[in-house]
Amino acid sequence: MAPRPQKKLFTRKKVCRFCADKELVIDYKDVKVLRNFVSERGKIIPRRIVGTCASHQRQLCEAVKRARQIALLPYSGSAQN
């Protein structure tokens, strides 16, 4: 049996949206922006999935944690039974 040919998958390089748009600022009070980086369960989405650079991912984590602490974001997602 001949080996199966490998399919070439084209993966698009993710660009950090904060590096691309210099006017977009990471702020713990801006809940609309922070919700894009938090999963339905309330977990912070990793940078390999979101596509942010390392420095902005660190800033995002700090902002999400601050927003959680002052109750702008929930610690866990909405519990739907």
UniProtKB/Swiss-Prot annotation:
Xref: Gene3D superfamilies: Ribosomal protein S18
GO MF entries: small ribosomal subunit rRNA binding; structural constituent of ribosome
Cellular-component GO terms for this entry: cytosolic small ribosomal subunit
GO biological process assignments: translation
InterPro entries named in the record: Ribosomal_bS18 (IPR001648), Ribosomal_bS18_CS (IPR018275), Ribosomal_bS18_sf (IPR036870)
Any Pfam family the entry gives: Ribosomal_S18
Keywords: Ribonucleoprotein, Ribosomal protein, RNA-binding, rRNA-binding
Subunit structure: Part of the 30S ribosomal subunit. Forms a tight heterodimer with protein bS6.
Family in the record: Belongs to the bacterial ribosomal protein bS18 family.
Reported function: Binds as a heterodimer with protein bS6 to the central domain of the 16S rRNA, where it helps stabilize the platform of the 30S subunit.
Record-given protein name: Small ribosomal subunit protein bS18
Organism name: Desulfotalea psychrophila (strain LSv54 / DSM 12343)
Name of the encoding gene: rpsR
